[in-house]
Curated annotation (Swiss-Prot):
Zn(2+) binds at E184, H247, H264. The gene is aroB. The lineage of its organism: Bacteria, Pseudomonadati, Pseudomonadota, Betaproteobacteria, Rhodocyclales. This is 3-dehydroquinate synthase. One of its GO terms (molecular function) is 3-dehydroquinate synthase activity. One of its GO terms (biological process) is amino acid biosynthetic process. The keyword NAD applies.
């Protein structure tokens, strides 16, 4: 097991990474205010891992209540969130009860938002079970649900008490989900860690083959990058915005195509290629670097072209992005592999041409 730390002063918390951490109640118990938890999971992850987590906690004297949500991005909404509140109220959970998210990014985002708002805040623990949630969404305290007009538009910053990333849960992860998670790993290499990008170019097939050492390295290196950024800029006033490389385009894809039709990582991959193309057109990124970025995404089994939505639809959806400031669209772009910038000066016609060049 490897432990990293998210340095947020008196709200600092550890990230425990390794096989079997799910079964170790001793990693959870110190962070409980009382001997009571409520677990939020879904109908895919629950049958695989709920009994193990519940058994470990109950053996340690902890009372466990559970709510199982329907799986998928299409359910990340008020209606599903209310199922969590229904359980918390029906079982008389208190402000001191700890909410545990057992699942991928959708479960973590919704459980975290429930924890942030139930009785104005209850303790929260992340147990991510997908590659994407282990390397990205479980760390940093972003919680949200979707709105028909935009992804993650209703939410809060709310940090977990501890993150348990059990790498053995990736053994049951579908190949498509594994590949989608790699989009976020590649992102860290592109925005701030060129050595990670080089490593991925050399070892991407090992990660796809789920070699334990390669997976562990990719997860640990990604979490270390995320932890550093979050510690420096918790509420996304500066550097943390760079973690959104590809996300402005990607969220437009997810919203425009209907939540769940494109996985988040797939949309981020296509969005990253749009950002790379725009960076090239602005004279920042060389054609050779764009080709390297595309080649790595292709080897990872990720899309490098977005869906053929009208450019006007992309731009309309992107106008709802959370990084828009005073009506100006701010995009995360690349000066080089390993150096990202937040840029608000790109002309709409150049943005549109970049989108058009990267639509299938």
């Amino acid at each position: 097991m490897r432990t990293l730390n998210v340095a947020l002063g008196d709200r600092a918390y550890p990230i425990h990474i390794g096989p079997g951490v799910l079964d170790n109640a001793g990693l959870i118990r110190p962070f409980l205010r009382t001997a009571r938890v409520a677990i939020v999971t879904n109908d895919v992850v629950g049958p695989l891992y709920l009994a193990r987590l519940q058994r470990a906690l109950e053996a340690d004297g902890v009372r466990v209540d559970v709510v199982t949500l329907p799986d998928g991005e299409s359910h990340k909404n008020w209606q599903t969130l209310n199922l969590v509140f229904d359980m918390l109220l029906a079982t008389r959970c208190e402000r001191s009860t700890t909410l545990i998210a057992l699942g991928g990014g959708v479960v973590g985002d919704m459980a975290g938002f429930a924890a942030a708002t139930y009785q104005r805040g209850m303790p929260f623990i992340q147990v991510p079970t997908t590659l994407l949630s282990q390397v990205d969404s479980s760390v940093g305290g972003k919680t949200a649900i979707n709105h028909p007009l935009g992804k993650n538009m209703i939410g809060a910053f709310y940090q977990p008490r501890v993150v348990l990333a059990d790498t053995a849960t990736l053994d049951t992860l579908p190949d498509r989900e594994l590949k989608a998670g790699l989009a976020e790993v590649i992102k860290y290499g592109l925005i701030r860690d060129p050595a990670l990008f080089d490593w991925l170019e050399a070892h991407i097939e090992r990660v796809l083959a789920r070699e334990p050492e390669a997976l562990a390295f990719a997860i640990e290196r990604s979490c270390a990058n995320k932890a550093e950024v979050v510690a420096a800029d918790e509420t996304e006033q500066g550097e943390r915005a760079l973690l959104n490389l590809g996300h402005t385009f990607g969220h437009a894809i997810e919203t425009g195509m209907g939540y769940g039709n494109w996985l988040h990582g797939e949309a981020v991959a296509a969005g990253t290629m749009m950002a790379a193309e725009l960076s090239r057109r602005l004279g920042w990124l060389s054609a050779a670097d764009v080709a390297r970025i595309e080649a790595l995404h292709v080897r990872a089994g990720l899309p490098v072209l977005g869906p053929p939505l009208p450019v006007a639809t992309y731009l309309e959806l992107m106008a709802n992005d959370k990084k828009v400031e005073e009506g100006r669209l701010r995009l995360v772009l690349l000066r080089s592999i390993g150096k990202a910038v937040l840029h608000a000066g790109a002309a709409p016609d150049v943005i549109g041409a970049s989108i058009e060049a990267r639509c299938g």
